[in-house]
């Protein structure tokens, strides 16, 4: 099918041209293979915040929105079993204290809604490293004496094995608590399981006695982002807990990228033997086996999953040879029959159609082929001839506009989704009558919908995710999209027509891309393999109980593309993670999945193992590896349109842009350059992180950032502009940039469209949407006045804060230093002396105000004798100013550092009790200003350099961060209600 021909859907009947498709299929097999690689074109900006070098404390307030700093906890990574790990809080849970003392919880005028039942905290206890090491080695020693037929491992959460070193912090939102549980050698899996069930009834989860851990429960909602913290340690998966299938030496060098070297169907196993050119087929019931031979190293092998036919094995080798064997069981002997071989087939991806053993799909160049082998008979086929000489081999295909990156077929076999660059094309899949002998009854390939992905980087792969509804009709409600070099997985829920979840497989400490992404028919489980980790996610999609007439996935996608919406938000229901200890994972395959258990086959460097995970009642509520940050939003966006999308507008506009530099009409150039300026930063992290102070700062920052990075942006602009035009981040741009940036952007793009620049970046051939660009230009101009007013309002925040800080200052002494060289030292000494005198006569409040006015190390040293409860007499404005100046002091003495933490904690707790009354009774201290100062204080506290190795000091520092975060959440709730 020609992608650009103007044909109606009814005329697009590729199944009716089987003969023509066969000829194209066989001719394409002998040509060169296609290239699937696409570079990552991530265009995220990082703006380094400025800081002045002061001897005592930092510069005056910079009112900035540091969302990224708030969500990135610096947690050092440590070994799994070598360091001593103890929880920070043994007998005191600061989170419970914060909840109990919150005015929003106690005040009858609380603006917050009642927490749902699923927002229950489960504080779990931890053990020391010595107990863990002892129990771990005892388990290994016991495992060596186990039989190789051990089939099941207890189903545990990822958090069951999460560990922290003394230098690490537990989650600041919900620190773990509880008494330590002693480790006993006699503890068995069944005893632990029984104890867990008993503790669940008491609402107390007791961990496995040999490992420390913590678990946080979350309330499922739209837009959650799950990430793996740097300190995350997965559950150790011991081979003694698996059923060994075969022992083999399988080094990584033997196999290729995305290899599948083992599969199972019914009672048959097929796996690559010690020789990479040998495939061993094993009957698990009779222990009989035989060896199949290939011309070169095996790259992939798959069993057909049709339970009503004989097993068929599809094999591909490194020389692009394709084999199909039929497995036969004759009484007590196992035998095979080679159906056919395709020599040197330059295919990309090849696999069976779901629940089929007579049709498989494969990619050749820019086309997806469906091959039918149901009419082939092995007794009259010579395995040495080419496939084009066979009688009975049928093929149908669909052509795409570019190289196919990935494709997936729905569980009900009604839809095939094909990923090309940043677009997903959905076609109806008439599998039942695609190769009907009657031409009038043959099914049609119909274009259902097109999804335009708007991602921070290029999409890598796609996969359908299904779950059976009440009527037992399988409908795939979710499509998984991996991007950012397979480090982020986004879940697009068709019920809401939006990305509802993102799972991040990387953090600041390590990058762990997804090396394999697996889903199983009729299941909502996602299995991701990364390095030596197996991560399992169970997604509960939106409820489609009200769809009624929708009978399959094709009907659902078609209805959603036309504007209909079904159900509520989906959410990640369960998270499990296992780490294979001392072994490398070559490949993982799913062989069975239902509501009670999950069966996997692991191809490890030492052999093949069958691993079964059984469900457990303690996973009824959702668990997360890291408590989601409410400020962290999903970046992935997508728009679903009905049918195929025309690209005629793109081609027409590309010529206009190419001739832009030759035009002498300034108005034409101005329109185009301003439009390009609107789409230059699709993700807009610059404007997310920095709020401009005034128009001059806007001009300065826009100029410096754009001039230094404009060339790098245009290197990726050729593949992104069409998507960015409709990106929702354009609204963010219109709300934050000021009118002062217009002239600067215009001058920059006039330079860009000069002839020398066009010669340098000749790839500007890519087109843009003319109408959308024109509309954006009009919107951009009309919003300038509002943006300028917003910038001026933000610019006044610093001035207002400075005025507030002077309300309660005391008059300074009349002492005047005679020498300018010792002015600062004399003033600091005078303030310190005055503070000390005020403390001596018990005027604690006046001493605190004096320090707030002129903060210094000497003045703070004089405050050490002031009891922290004296802060209760201070006003809210003074407390806010006090925690601000105290957080900026640079302290290098352990005793002073400890005193600062104690005073900051007391002042912050006092602020929490008076927050609502401050906002209701004060006309000057606004919630916006209050929130800005608290964010700056939180940023400064996170950057404290603790002096000494006192565990008490570390716990107080952690508690202070938790208190500030709780205060910030309460202010945000007040602002949002």
UniProtKB/Swiss-Prot annotation:
<feature type="compositionally biased region" description="Basic and acidic residues">
    <location>
        <begin position="131"/>
        <end position="144"/>
    </location>
</feature>
<dbReference type="InterPro" id="IPR055393">
    <property type="entry name" value="Beta-prop_EDC4L"/>
</dbReference>
<dbReference type="GO" id="GO:0005829">
    <property type="term" value="C:cytosol"/>
</dbReference>
<dbReference type="GO" id="GO:0010494">
    <property type="term" value="C:cytoplasmic stress granule"/>
</dbReference>
<feature type="region of interest" description="Disordered">
    <location>
        <begin position="100"/>
        <end position="152"/>
    </location>
</feature>
<keyword id="KW-0597">Phosphoprotein</keyword>
<feature type="compositionally biased region" description="Polar residues">
    <location>
        <begin position="183"/>
        <end position="193"/>
    </location>
</feature>
<dbReference type="GO" id="GO:0005737">
    <property type="term" value="C:cytoplasm"/>
</dbReference>
<protein>
    <recommendedName>
        <fullName>Uncharacterized protein C12G12.09</fullName>
    </recommendedName>
</protein>
<feature type="region of interest" description="Disordered">
    <location>
        <begin position="166"/>
        <end position="194"/>
    </location>
</feature>
<dbReference type="Pfam" id="PF24106">
    <property type="entry name" value="Beta-prop_EDC4L"/>
</dbReference>
<feature type="compositionally biased region" description="Basic and acidic residues">
    <location>
        <begin position="109"/>
        <end position="124"/>
    </location>
</feature>
<feature type="compositionally biased region" description="Polar residues">
    <location>
        <begin position="166"/>
        <end position="175"/>
    </location>
</feature>
<feature type="modified residue" description="Phosphoserine">
    <location>
        <position position="165"/>
    </location>
</feature>
């Amino acid at each position: 099918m020609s992608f650009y021909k103007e044909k109606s859907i009814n005329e697009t009947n590729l199944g009716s041209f089987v003969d023509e498709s066969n000829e194209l299929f066989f001719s394409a097999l002998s040509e060169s293979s296609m290239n699937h690689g696409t570079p990552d074109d991530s265009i995220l900006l990082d703006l380094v915040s400025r800081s002045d070098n002061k001897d005592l404390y930092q510069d005056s307030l910079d009112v900035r929105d540091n969302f990224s700093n708030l969500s990135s906890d610096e947690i050092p990574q440590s070994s799994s079993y070598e360091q001593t790990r103890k929880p920070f809080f043994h007998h005191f849970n600061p989170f419970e204290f914060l909840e109990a003392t919150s005015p929003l919880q106690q005040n009858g005028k609380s603006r917050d809604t009642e927490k749902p039942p699923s927002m229950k905290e489960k504080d779990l206890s931890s053990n020391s490293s010595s107990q863990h090491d002892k129990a771990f080695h005892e388990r290994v020693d016991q495992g060596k004496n186990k039989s190789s037929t051990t089939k099941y491992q207890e189903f545990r959460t990822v958090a069951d094995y999460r560990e922290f070193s003394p230098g690490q912090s537990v989650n600041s939102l919900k620190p773990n608590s509880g008494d330590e549980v002693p480790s006993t050698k006699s503890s068995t899996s069944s005893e632990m399981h029984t104890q867990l069930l008993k503790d669940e009834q008491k609402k107390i989860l007791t961990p496995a006695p040999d490992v420390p851990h913590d678990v946080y429960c979350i309330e499922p909602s739209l837009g959650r982002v799950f990430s793996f913290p740097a300190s995350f340690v997965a559950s150790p998966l011991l081979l003694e807990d698996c059923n060994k299938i075969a022992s083999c030496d399988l080094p990584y060098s033997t196999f290729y990228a995305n290899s599948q070297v083992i599969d199972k169907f019914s009672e048959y196993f097929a796996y690559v033997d010690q020789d990479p050119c040998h495939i061993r087929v094993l009957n698990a019931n009779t222990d009989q086996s035989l060896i199949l031979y290939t011309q070169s190293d095996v790259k992939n092998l798959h069993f057909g999953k049709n339970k009503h036919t004989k097993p068929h094995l599809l094999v591909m080798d490194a020389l692009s040879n394709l084999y199909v064997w039929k497995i036969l069981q004759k009484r007590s002997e196992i035998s095979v029959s080679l159906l056919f071989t395709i020599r040197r087939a330059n295919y990309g991806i090849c696999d069976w159609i779901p629940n089929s053993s007579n049709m498989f799909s494969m990619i050749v160049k820019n086309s997806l082929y469906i091959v039918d082998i149901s009419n082939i008979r092995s007794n009259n086929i010579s395995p040495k001839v080419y496939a084009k000489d066979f009688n009975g081999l049928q093929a149908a295909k669909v052509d795409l506009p570019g190289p196919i990156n990935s494709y997936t077929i729905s569980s009900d076999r009604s839809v095939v989704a094909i990923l090309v660059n940043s677009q997903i094309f959905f076609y109806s899949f008439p599998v039942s009558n695609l190769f009907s002998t009657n031409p009038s009854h043959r099914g049609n390939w119909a274009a259902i919908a097109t999804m335009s992905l708007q991602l921070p980087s290029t999409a890598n792969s796609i996969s359908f995710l299904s779950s059976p509804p009440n009527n037992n009709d399988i409908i795939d409600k979710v499509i998984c999209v991996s991007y950012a070099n397979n480090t982020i997985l986004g879940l697009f829920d068709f019920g809401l027509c939006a990305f509802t979840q993102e799972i991040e497989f990387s953090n600041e400490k390590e990058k762990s891309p997804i090396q394999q992404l697996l889903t199983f028919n009729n299941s909502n489980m996602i299995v991701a393999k990364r390095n030596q980790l197996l991560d399992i996610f169970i997604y509960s999609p939106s409820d489609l109980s009200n769809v009624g007439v929708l009978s399959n996935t094709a009907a659902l996608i078609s209805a959603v593309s036309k504007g209909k919406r079904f159900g509520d938000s989906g959410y990640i229901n369960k998270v499990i993670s296992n780490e294979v200890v001392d072994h490398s994972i070559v490949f993982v395959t799913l062989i069975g999945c239902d509501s009670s258990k999950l069966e996997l086959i692991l191809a490890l460097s030492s052999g093949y193992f069958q691993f079964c995970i059984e469900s457990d009642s303690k996973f009824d509520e959702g668990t997360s590896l890291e408590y989601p940050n409410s400020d962290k939003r999903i970046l992935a966006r997508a728009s679903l349109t009905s049918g195929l999308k025309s690209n005629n507008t793109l081609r027409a506009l590309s010529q206009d842009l190419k001739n832009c530099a030759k035009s002498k009409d300034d108005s034409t150039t101005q329109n185009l350059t301003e439009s390009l300026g609107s789409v230059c930063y699709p993700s807009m992290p610059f404007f997310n992180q920095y709020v401009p102070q005034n128009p001059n700062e806007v001009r300065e920052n826009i100029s410096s950032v754009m001039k230094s990075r404009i060339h790098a942006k245009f290197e990726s602009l050729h593949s992104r502009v069409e998507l960015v035009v409709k990106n929702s981040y354009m609204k963010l741009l219109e709300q934050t940039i000021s009118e002062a940036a217009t002239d600067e952007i215009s001058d920059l793009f006039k330079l860009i469209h000069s002839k020398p620049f066009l010669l340098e970046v000749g790839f500007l051939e890519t087109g843009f949407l003319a109408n959308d660009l024109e509309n954006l230009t009009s919107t951009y101009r009309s919003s300038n006045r509002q943006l300028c007013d917003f910038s001026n309002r933000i610019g006044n925040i610093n001035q207002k804060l400075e005025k507030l800080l002077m309300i309660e200052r005391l008059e300074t002494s009349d002492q005047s230093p005679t020498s300018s060289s010792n002015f600062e030292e004399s003033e600091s000494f005078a303030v310190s002396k005055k503070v000390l005198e005020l403390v001596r006569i018990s005027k604690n409040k006046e001493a605190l105000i004096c320090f707030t006015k002129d903060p210094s190390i000497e003045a703070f040293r004089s405050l050490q004798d002031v009891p922290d409860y004296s802060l209760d007499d201070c006003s809210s404005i003074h407390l806010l100013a006090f925690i601000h100046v105290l957080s900026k002091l640079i302290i290098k003495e352990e005793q002073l550092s400890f005193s600062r933490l104690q005073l900051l904690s007391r002042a912050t707790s006092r602020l929490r009790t008076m927050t609502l009354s401050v906002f209701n009774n004060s006309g000057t201290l606004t919630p916006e200003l209050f929130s800005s100062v608290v964010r700056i204080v939180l940023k400064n506290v996170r950057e404290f350099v603790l002096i000494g190795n006192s565990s008490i000091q570390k716990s107080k520092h952690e508690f202070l961060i938790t208190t500030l975060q709780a205060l910030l959440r309460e202010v945000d709730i007040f602002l949002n209600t």
